[in-house]
Amino acid sequence: MGVNISGRSFLKLLDFSTEEIEYLLALSKNFKDMKRAGVPHRYLEGKNVVLLFQKTSTRTRCAFEVGAMDLGMGVTYLDPGSSQMGKKESIEDTARVLGRMYDGIEFRGFAQADVECLADNAGVPVWNGLTTEWHPTQMLADVLTIQENFNYQIKGRTVVFMGDCKNNVARSLMVVCAKLGMNYVACGPVDCMPGADVVDACTPIAAENGCTITLTQSVEEACTGADVIYTDVWVSMGEPDEVWEQRIAELEPYRVTSACMEMAKPEAIFLHCLPAFHDTNTTIGAEKAEQFGITEMEVTDEVFESKRSKVFDEAENRMHTIKAVMYAPLK
């Protein structure tokens, strides 16, 4: 393919060409095949990475840690209480220190400007594990899952995002669909539609790759003939508790139900980046059930637990795709 990502940071998918994204996906598949076959792939022995987390995580942290160790690298995890970044030491200075000690830096936090500042100053590749604006590593896992379920023929497929279409996952999903030639449909209330910045950036990319971007408030219009129906939590990390009541009122009509899946193609799949509020078996789920009288939020338990739900394949694929994201610039 002739793609070279050596030394590059992975901050948002708009920075990468279609060919580069396809290369990372092919690499991810290779790593998954090796992992499944028990074939060692410690190609980065002797290198070290640091994981900077301002926001808590299960999948992102585990995927980076296991992925790095599988590749033979040493890993340091720094949570907000373990580093002076942004408190006693600027992000610029932190980047310059860590860049002297580590071969790569992962950042999961709030501002996109922070991860870009790290990348500008570290002198080593920096990987965006999530910011308020973008979630690029999640997208590779999502697309690998779509590929696996549609015999790697994804061009022309239709991906629907239901709910808060302005969040980091929905924005990133629009980008990756446009880059890879999949039709993208954002379905939610007017106040939860994606911003003009991402729509304007993606529209010409989609046109170039022969696909479309659609914004709609109609669940029926969105779900009819869909190949993939995707949703995410209604309130994102870092948002105040006060928004719950408004979000539930706004987004309840956009819950993914069996009726939604029935409108989609017979082979359609359901995706969710997790964690999901599909029952009351969590502290927050139980609390909101008592407060608002709902036992399911963005997706029904029936859909979540159905054969069409590929959410745990998707979660596993975080590890294989993140491995590719680390390996490509460090090999």
What does each model-found stretch correspond to?
Residues M1-C62, V66:
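Positively charged, low-complexity intrinsically disordered leader regions
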Residues P204-D301:
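Rossmann-like adenosine-cofactor binding region
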Residues I154, A178, A259-A268, S306:
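Short, conserved loop/helix-junction motifs that constitute active-site signature segments
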Residues N48-M101:
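Active-site cofactor/substrate anionic-group-binding motifs, chiefly glycine-
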Residues A289-K331:
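C-terminal helix-to-coil terminal segments
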Residues Q54-V66, N151-D232, M237-E239:
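Glycine-rich phosphate/diphosphate-binding loop of Rossmann-like nucleotide-binding domains
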Residues V39, D103-V176, H272:
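Anion-binding alpha/beta catalytic cores of soluble intermediary-metabolism enzymes, centered on
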